[in-house]
């Protein structure tokens, strides 16, 4: 097999915590990563530290505050910034666009289906990231669709003519397997399915509905995350 998208060869992003980077073999890899821990064990603090690392590396990122409990003063102290707008941006007084563009997009959406479909929609608009063993290089692979070619030009990427002849697709060499987008959900247990309503007054039924919806929505997203 001349082509592989093995995550072991890919880029790993620092968590900004040396010990955790060592435990995770260099940092966060592409794909699905879950931080488990008891209540008040530091999961949200880790998420805030991760935001700082993402912002510094200019990786398009999204913070999904499903709990709706982000303490902006605490977040600034952890991240070492003076104002949370340094991350989330500041909207224009007119309400149109941003006065200060966001480095990280913020939403407090907590409906499970909406969150995963939002993530899926963004990932589907990104080209596949592929490591080729025959060349020993990373590539972003674009189709010949108009939207793909426009994105390729906007990013200033040039395709490999030889690979285009072989495959009929645009293979654009990139320095490493750095992931193209990151999503921080704080937290998964705070997401609720749209089916859980007043009629689901029994806790056991609500848990079952959440589990079923999660299993359905997460599969396509996990696959896309590893490819992007």
List each model region and its residues.
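Intrinsically disordered, low-complexity acidic Ser/Thr-rich regulatory segments
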Residues: 151-180
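Substrate-engagement module of ASCE P-loop NTPases
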Residues: 56, 171-172, 205-228
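Glycine- and charge-rich intrinsically disordered segments
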Residues: 135-138, 142-159
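Conserved P-loop NTPase nucleotide-binding/switch module
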Residues: 181-219
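A short beta-strand-to-loop transition that corresponds to the Sensor-1 phosphate-sensing loop
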Residues: 65-67, 186-188, 225-228
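Active-site glycine- and acidic-residue-rich loops that bind
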Residues: 113, 117, 163-165, 212
């Amino acid at each position: 097999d001349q082509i592989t998208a093995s995550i072991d060869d890919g880029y790993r992003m620092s968590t900004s915590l040396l010990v955790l980077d060592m435990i995770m073999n260099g940092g966060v890899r592409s794909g699905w990563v879950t931080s488990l821990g008891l209540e008040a064990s530091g999961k949200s603090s880790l998420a805030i530290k991760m935001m700082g690392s993402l912002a510094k590396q200019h990786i398009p990122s999204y913070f999904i505050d499903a709990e709706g409990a982000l303490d902006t003063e605490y977040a600034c102290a952890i991240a070492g910034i003076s104002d949370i707008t340094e991350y989330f941006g500041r909207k224009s007084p007119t309400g149109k666009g941003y006065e200060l563009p966001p480095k990280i997009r913020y939403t407090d959406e907590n409906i499970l289906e909406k969150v995963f479909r939002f993530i899926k929609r963004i990932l589907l608009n990104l080209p596949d990231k592929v490591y080729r063993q025959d060349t020993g290089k990373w590539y972003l692979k674009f189709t010949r669709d108009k939207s793909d070619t426009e994105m390729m030009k906007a990013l200033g990427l040039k395709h490999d003519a030889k690979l285009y002849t072989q495959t009929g697709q645009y293979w654009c060499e990139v320095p490493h397997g750095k992931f193209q987008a990151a999503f921080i959900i704080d937290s998964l247990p705070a997401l609720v399915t749209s089916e859980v309503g007043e009629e689901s007054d029994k806790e056991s039924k609500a848990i079952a509905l959440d589990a079923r919806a999660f299993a359905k929505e997460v599969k396509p997203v996990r696959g896309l995350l590893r490819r992007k």
